[in-house]
């Protein structure tokens, strides 16, 4: 025996009714089939609306006609699809049902209310008509059909007309006494049962699924299939978490936990009978019959797939009960549970403080006023005598739950969850582990639940580490960085690293990207973008940031942008920058950035500020962490000047060498910054501050390469033209040095007596800076550990490729 249950969306029209009949036919080849049917989609909602409109005496007949027309249109469509369908017979049944409904409505109009027993009769009409229609379809295909009347055979416990529970033992006896022919297809309306007086009652929310589970138990079915409009149970709601995965199988206990904490596929009551009688339950999709679905069974899940889902409940309120004189907290909890049970109120989660004088529990917000009334009545004396404090209520909360087999045995699950929430700046208000040890639940603000679910899910179910990158500046460095990221995609995929480019901007406009954008075509997409860029837009993007690992990448030389770094960091962004302006601003701002980093746990990475792709900053920081101290520093910190002076040695004129350096991407946007020495001074300032010196840019003495009276042009072409006036002067200086076996180098120096200066020096062949040219940088650190031979870092210190690679490296360091 196999039981099949079909939901309302599977019966929404004539075509879907026939699809369901085909599924039933196919299954009859191997098993006897019992079928439980819901009302067609929308019908139950219309029937509820009929009751509401009747009580208000508003648009009654219009709503009745809407519901009736769904059925009439449905059976009319059968005429075009299946010629032998008994259209007239079913039409009579439908009209009879709706005529009876209209008579019932007259009684409601007189009473101006709808008793529960009448409400149950009205809202269950859809299921009954579904059975009549399916019976006619199957009989027209020459199948023998037996209809089980749930009012006569499913025995409801108690007198609740709208949310009954079935006595499976008694119901089983009734159904066995029917002696149903084994060759017949069994049909039964879902959602319905009968009380001890054989009066119709309904089974509450998701009652048709519950009916199916009950009937499966009564028939000793070897399988229960729930056919719906989704492929099965997912690791999270696919509408909210697009990369949620279909679960092939889950245990009864896991299914119970998932449904209890918000998963929509099955109601906990549905799982109870199939778990009790160990009936495997398969969730299938009528719109995708080839999908394997999800099997719910007794077998424990494999160790590999111990995590099963991330789900949530919304519209939650948390009550806080406390008092300085609670002597017996167990008694208080007992009274709370008794009181809530009497009021038919569900406690979703409960926690108790270690001091045993405070209890928190969560309920649905719609129960708040009912609870307050019951509490004030139950604890009237304790409140009056000050033994209990006035109750505190927190609203607008959600419960985030993580479900899996023996989740408590996995020591790193909680740490991963808290790490994600911490990165998102989401505070956990309460935490609880289910008594079944199959779930962990956390209470957070409702406004944070969507991003919490998405990021916790992605962290737990995917090993992939994600960076959400906002790139500002797409000149030489920025565009090269994008090309490097594209080139390294396969390598990053192997390392389970994903870099998502969320925005690309320059000083004029911004391109916002999503997962559908093809990054290989970013230049054309950027040209087409019409959205103007400004700091206000950027700040709005930042405030609405829902990502756990977001990075602002600054590849500009903008002072204004650098002044926003504290704001970026405080709003949950890492900052990676090739822009030296922030680190060379006033000391107070320099410290303010680092204070924000310390407070937020975000990263501020600027390796390229001094040596482009050379590991200068990290090396220096690691030296100091290990207890070393700087004694003296000598370095060539300008790749552009390294290139220029190398070319001068080869007989190239200054103006020509400078133009070549700019064309190769070695210089700043205006080469004047390089030749003035100010760019080197900024780098030396950064090194000095990293070494513990509290200094400003003005404390660095610069002996400029350019004469004091040399006119500076902001226009690059004019500046390079003007530079020709110095060609002969520098050619002569180079020759003088070479004549005595020396070379000219523009050297930055830190000496122990707080001496910081930059000047053009002659260096001999024994100096570590002697052979440095062609765009190389060289940094010689004399420290307690490295003397008399210094620690020397040497390599290309300018150029788009090496600088972009340094930024790329910093970007990846945000994951550590």
Swiss-Prot record:
* Catalytic residues (positions): 683
Q: Which reaction does it catalyse?
A: L-homoserine + NADP(+) = L-aspartate 4-semialdehyde + NADPH + H(+); L-homoserine + NAD(+) = L-aspartate 4-semialdehyde + NADH + H(+); L-aspartate + ATP = 4-phospho-L-aspartate + ADP
Q: List residues binding NADPH.
A: 477, 556-557, 578, 580, 799
Q: Where does L-homoserine bind?
A: 668, 679
User: Region (Aspartokinase) spans which residues?
Assistant: 1-250
Cofactor(s) recorded in Swiss-Prot or TrEMBL: a metal cation
Give the stretches traversing the membrane: none
Q: Which molecular function term from Gene Ontology is one that the record holds?
A: NAD+ binding
Q: Which family does it belong to?
A: In the N-terminal section; belongs to the aspartokinase family.
Per its database record, what is this protein's job? Bifunctional aspartate kinase and homoserine dehydrogenase that catalyzes the first and the third steps toward the synthesis of lysine, methionine and threonine from aspartate.
Q: What is this protein called?
A: Bifunctional aspartokinase/homoserine dehydrogenase
Task: Give the organism the record lists.
Answer: Buchnera aphidicola subsp. Acyrthosiphon pisum (strain APS) (Acyrthosiphon pisum symbiotic bacterium)
Name of encoding gene: thrA
């Amino acid at each position: 025996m196999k039981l099949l249950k079909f939901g309302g969306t599977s019966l929404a029209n004539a075509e879907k009714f026939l699809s369901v009949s085909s599924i039933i036919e196919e299954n009859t080849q191997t098993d006897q089939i019992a079928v439980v049917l819901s009302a067609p989609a929308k019908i139950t909602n219309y029937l509820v609306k009929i009751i509401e409109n009747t009580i208000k005496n508003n648009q009654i007949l219009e709503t009745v006609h809407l519901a009736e027309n769904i059925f009439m249109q449905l059976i009319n469509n059968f005429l075009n699809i299946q010629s032998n369908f008994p259209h007239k017979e079913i039409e009579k049944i439908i009209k009879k049902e709706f005529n009876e409904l209209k008579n019932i409505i007259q009684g409601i109009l007189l009473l101006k209310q709808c008793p529960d027993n009448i409400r149950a009769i009205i809202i269950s009409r859809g299921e009954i008509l579904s059975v009549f229609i399916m019976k006619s379809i199957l009989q027209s295909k020459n199948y023998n059909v037996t209809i089980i009347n749930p009012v006569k055979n499913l025995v409801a416990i108690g007198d609740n007309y709208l949310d009954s529970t079935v006595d499976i033992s008694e119901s089983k006896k009734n159904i066995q006494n029917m002696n149903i022919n084994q060759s017949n297809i069994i049909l039964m309306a879902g959602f319905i049962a009968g009380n001890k007086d054989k009066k119709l009652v309904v089974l509450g929310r998701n009652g048709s699924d519950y009916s199916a589970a009950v009937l499966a138990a009564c028939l000793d079915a070897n399988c229960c299939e729930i056919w719906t409009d989704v492929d099965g149970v997912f690791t999270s709601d696919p509408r909210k978490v697009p990369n949620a995965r279909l679960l092939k199988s889950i245990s009864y206990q896991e299914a119970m936990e998932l449904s209890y904490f918000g998963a929509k596929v099955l109601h906990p009551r549905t799982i109870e009978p199939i778990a009790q009688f160990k009936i495997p339950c398969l969730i299938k999709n009528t719109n995708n019959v080839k999908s394997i679905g999800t099997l719910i069974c007794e077998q424990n899940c494999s160790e590999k797939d111990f995590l099963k889902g991330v789900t949530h409940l919304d519209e939650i309120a948390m009550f806080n009960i406390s008092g300085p004189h609670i002597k017996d907290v167990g008694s208080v909890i007992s009274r709370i549970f008794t009181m809530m049970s009497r009021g038919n109120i569900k406690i979703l989660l409960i926690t108790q403080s270690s001091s045993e004088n405070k209890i928190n529990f969560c309920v649905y917000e719609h129960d708040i006023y009912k609870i307050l009334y019951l509490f004030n009545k139950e604890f009237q004396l304790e409140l009056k005598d000050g033994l209990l404090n006035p109750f505190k209520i927190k609203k607008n909360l959600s419960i985030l739950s993580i479900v899996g087999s023996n989740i408590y045995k996995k020591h790193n699950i909680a740490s991963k969850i808290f790490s994600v929430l911490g990165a998102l700046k989401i505070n956990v208000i309460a935490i609880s582990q289910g008594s079944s040890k199959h779930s962990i639940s956390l209470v957070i603000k409702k406004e944070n639940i969507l991003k919490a679910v998405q990021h916790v899910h992605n962290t737990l179910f995917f090993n992939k580490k994600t960076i959400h990158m906002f790139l500002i500046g797409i000149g030489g460095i920025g565009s090269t960085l994008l090309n490097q990221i594209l080139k390294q995609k396969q390598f990053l995929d192997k390392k389970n690293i994903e870099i998502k480019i969320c925005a690309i901007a320059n000083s004029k406009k911004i391109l916002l990207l999503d997962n559908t954008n093809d990054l290989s075509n970013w230049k054309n997409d950027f040209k087409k973008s019409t959205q103007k860029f400004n700091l206000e837009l950027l700040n709005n993007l930042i405030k609405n940031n829902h990502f756990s690992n977001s990075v602002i990448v600054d590849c500009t030389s903008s002072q204004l942008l650098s002044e926003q770094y504290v704001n970026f960091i405080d709003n949950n962004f890492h900052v990676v920058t090739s822009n030296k302006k922030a680190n060379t601003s006033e000391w107070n701002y320099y410290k303010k950035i680092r204070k924000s980093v310390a407070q937020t746990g975000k990263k501020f990475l600027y390796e390229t500020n001094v040596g482009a792709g050379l590991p200068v900053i990290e090396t220096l920081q690691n030296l100091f962490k290990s207890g070393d101290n700087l004694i003296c520093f000598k370095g060539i910190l300008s790749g552009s000047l390294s290139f220029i002076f190398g070319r001068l040695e080869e007989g190239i004129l200054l103006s020509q060498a400078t133009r070549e350096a700019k064309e190769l991407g070695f210089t700043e946007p205006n080469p004047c910054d390089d030749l003035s020495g100010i760019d080197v001074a900024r780098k030396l300032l950064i090194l000095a501050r990293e070494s513990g010196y509290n200094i400003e840019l003005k404390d660095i003495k610069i002996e400029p390469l350019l004469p004091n009276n040399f006119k500076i042009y902001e226009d690059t072409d004019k500046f390079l033209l003007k530079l020709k006036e110095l060609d002969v002067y520098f050619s002569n200086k180079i020759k003088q040095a070479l004549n005595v076996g020396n070379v000219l180098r523009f050297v930055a120096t830190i000496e122990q007596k707080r001496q910081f200066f930059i000047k053009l020096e002659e260096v001999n062949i024994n100096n570590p800076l002697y052979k440095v040219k062609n765009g190389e940088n060289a940094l010689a650190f004399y420290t307690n550990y490295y003397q008399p031979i210094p620690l020397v870092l040497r390599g290309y210190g300018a150029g788009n490729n090496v600088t972009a690679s340094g930024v790329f490296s910093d970007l990846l360091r945000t994951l550590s």
